UniProtKB/Swiss-Prot annotation:
Gene3D superfamilies: YVTN repeat-like/Quinoprotein amine dehydrogenase. This is Uncharacterized WD repeat-containing protein YNL035C. It holds the Pfam family WD40. InterPro entries: WD40/YVTN_repeat-like_dom_sf (IPR015943), WD40_repeat_dom_sf (IPR036322), WD40_rpt (IPR001680), WDR89 (IPR039328). The lineage of its organism: Eukaryota, Fungi, Dikarya, Ascomycota, Saccharomycotina.
Amino acid sequence: MASYSLVESNSFGSENWCLKLQPSYKHGLLTGLSNGEIRLLDWSTGKSVQKIKASETAINDMKVIGSDFSAGHLVSSASIDAVKVFDIRTNDRIAQIQNEANSPFISLDSRHGLLACGTELQGIDAAVYIYDIRKWDTPLRSLIDSHHDDVTCIKFHPSDVNILLSGSTDGYTNIYDLKQDEEEDALHQVINYASIHSCGWLSPKRIFTLSHMETFAIHELNDKSDELKEPQPLDFGDVREIWNCDYVVDIYPGLIATGKTQENCGELCLLPFKDEKVDTENGIVIPHAHGDEVVRDIFIPAQHSNMLYSCGEDGCVKIWENKQGPLDIPENFWDYSKKMNVLGDDDREGSINLDEPLIIQKESVSTRPRKEKHKKAKKHSMKSRFKPY
């Protein structure tokens, strides 16, 4: 079992939770705080070198535009009032996005020249808005009928510009084919699992779902054939006992981060994760990483995988070093530079230029008839450790 030692610890106040980490390798490590600030941290010391006041309320989500971690200089933040985009180099706000329902924004993702924003439930609407990052005034697409509760997680397919994933507290994880103009047609697949804390792509056609109840499963992406061939998911069930944890931080390339919060027994654990198998025998435990408080996010730099950055509800960002050397983990779940057509339908064949957004359907001035959303009898409960968002 490898061991980590603490290199640096920087506190932003015990009542000021550190909720998210995003790398901007050229500028520093970004963290989003519950007081509405984004801080840019020095890679070596973890000290704040820049402050962006993004909101008066918590940073619910934060994403480097385009997922351009090597050279990117734009960062987006989601809060109750708006999604805002800032230039790290100048601190200038270059865009502010709001929606007609004034719904709080709680989730973000950005790839392929696009930014997707998910909202809380407002009335009967919980929406996903997709923007061309060259034109912030009007969304390219609004998906307003596919979720009926908070949209907690959004992920573009890293290799297919036309595929989007969204997860919600309504229990559904939706996969959209953005080549389809009508939302009903664009809703390619619905995974009915549980209230979603996190979801994403493990491989080009494999999807993970992590729930607020600490259940975990892996699902197959359906193709477009007339016969439904979706296999049963690989369902791990409630992982707290089998992974010896109280909660799962998130799923990362090559590892799963878990935590414990019992009094005087708090810890962060890194479980090796490869080929959809979790190695519980060789987990790396950092005792009392953030005291007994919840760890919200971790980050391991691709070129310095002996280093680990963590942030949590104790208000701290901490830097750790693995004394036994770099971890053998990939930077991404697969090689994202390979362009793919994961649904394999004929009308999508050909060269896809990821520099040009391919979402054709733009917002219409006219109001189309509303379609019925899929319904669930009961909203899944959420655990307090996931607030604020």
